[in-house]
Amino acid sequence: MQHPAEHSPLGKTSEYVSSYTPSLLFPISRTAKWAELGLSAETLPYRGVDIWNCYELSWLTPAGKPVVAIGEFSIPADSPNIIESKSFKLYLNSLNQSAFDSREALRAVLQKDLSAAAGAPVGVRLRSLDEVAEEGIGRLPGRCIDELDIAVDGYEQPRPELLRCDAGRIVEEQLYSHLLKSNCPVTGQPDWGTLVVDYRGPALDPASLLAYLVSFRQHQDFHEQCVERIFLDLQRLLQPQALSVYARYVRRGGLDINPYRSLAEVAPDNRRLVRQ
C-alpha cells in the first residue's frame, strides 16, 4: 500500500520559496495509522499533543528589517491531520522575505494556516532567543535505563511481546531512554529520540522496556505513530492507573517534533534536551 506521504515533498527535490505561501503545507490524515492500531477518532484511549519547535524562523518588519524567533507549535493529538515535516519547513521558509506588521500579526497568521492544515486549533508561541536561552538544557527526572545489559536479536518491527511486568507490585515511576530510533517511512532517514515513560501501575521490567524500544531501530513510521504504538502496548500490558509516553526527537531541518500521549489532560514540559 502506498504511504499517504508519497505525494508530499518528502524525498523530492524542492524549490525554496521566499514569499509567504500557505499552500505549501501538506496535511496527512491520521485515520489510516489510527486504523492500523485498531483506533478511530471516536475511540482514542489517550489525550495529548505534538509539540513542534522551530529554530529557523525569520521574517521582515514593514521597514524591511529581519526578525528572528523560536516558534512553538502545539497540534492536538486528536486533530484529523498531522502536517508533513518537509512541507512545514518549506512553509516556514516562505516567511523569510515576507513583511508582517508585528510579531502578533505573524503569530495570528501561523495559527490560522496551521489550524487549517491540522483540522483543529493549533497553539502558537513565538519566543525570543533570550527567553529560550534562559531555560537552559533540560535534565530528565527518573531513571535512565540505557546502561542495562540486554541481548538484542531483532530490529525490524516493534516487539511488544518483549515487555514484562510484575503484576503483584504497584509502583509509580518515570523511566527514560535515549536509545529510541526509528526511520522515516518515505526517505528511510533515521529519527533519533529520547523516550520517557511515566506511569502508576504494575512494575514494568526496565530491561524489557529497553529491549522493546530497541526493536524500533529499523521500524519505519512517523514520530507520532511510534509514540502511539508504544503507549498502546504499555497500556495493554500494564492496565495502569496513570500513564504518559513522551518522545523528544532530535531536530531535522530546523524542526524538532515531540509527541506526548497520556491518560490525563496534562501539558508536558517543552524544555529542550541536550541533543535538541
UniProtKB/Swiss-Prot annotation:
<comment type="subunit">
    <text>Homodimer.</text>
</comment>
<feature type="binding site">
    <location>
        <begin position="252"/>
        <end position="253"/>
    </location>
    <ligand>
        <name>NADPH</name>
    </ligand>
</feature>
<dbReference type="InterPro" id="IPR050084">
    <property type="entry name" value="NADPH_dep_7-cyano-7-deazaG_red"/>
</dbReference>
<feature type="binding site">
    <location>
        <begin position="83"/>
        <end position="85"/>
    </location>
    <ligand>
        <name>substrate</name>
    </ligand>
</feature>
<keyword id="KW-0560">Oxidoreductase</keyword>
<dbReference type="GO" id="GO:0033739">
    <property type="term" value="F:preQ1 synthase activity"/>
</dbReference>
<keyword id="KW-0671">Queuosine biosynthesis</keyword>
<dbReference type="GO" id="GO:0006400">
    <property type="term" value="P:tRNA modification"/>
</dbReference>
<dbReference type="Pfam" id="PF14489">
    <property type="entry name" value="QueF"/>
</dbReference>
<keyword id="KW-0521">NADP</keyword>
<comment type="similarity">
    <text>Belongs to the GTP cyclohydrolase I family. QueF type 2 subfamily.</text>
</comment>
<comment type="pathway">
    <text>tRNA modification; tRNA-queuosine biosynthesis.</text>
</comment>
<feature type="active site" description="Thioimide intermediate">
    <location>
        <position position="184"/>
    </location>
</feature>
<dbReference type="GO" id="GO:0008616">
    <property type="term" value="P:queuosine biosynthetic process"/>
</dbReference>
<dbReference type="InterPro" id="IPR029139">
    <property type="entry name" value="QueF_N"/>
</dbReference>
<feature type="binding site">
    <location>
        <begin position="85"/>
        <end position="86"/>
    </location>
    <ligand>
        <name>NADPH</name>
    </ligand>
</feature>
<feature type="binding site">
    <location>
        <begin position="223"/>
        <end position="224"/>
    </location>
    <ligand>
        <name>substrate</name>
    </ligand>
</feature>
<protein>
    <recommendedName>
        <fullName>NADPH-dependent 7-cyano-7-deazaguanine reductase</fullName>
        <ecNumber>1.7.1.13</ecNumber>
    </recommendedName>
</protein>
<feature type="active site" description="Proton donor">
    <location>
        <position position="191"/>
    </location>
</feature>
<dbReference type="InterPro" id="IPR016428">
    <property type="entry name" value="QueF_type2"/>
</dbReference>
<dbReference type="InterPro" id="IPR029500">
    <property type="entry name" value="QueF"/>
</dbReference>
<dbReference type="InterPro" id="IPR043133">
    <property type="entry name" value="GTP-CH-I_C/QueF"/>
</dbReference>
<dbReference type="GO" id="GO:0005737">
    <property type="term" value="C:cytoplasm"/>
</dbReference>
<comment type="function">
    <text>Catalyzes the NADPH-dependent reduction of 7-cyano-7-deazaguanine (preQ0) to 7-aminomethyl-7-deazaguanine (preQ1).</text>
</comment>
<keyword id="KW-0963">Cytoplasm</keyword>
<dbReference type="Pfam" id="PF14819">
    <property type="entry name" value="QueF_N"/>
</dbReference>
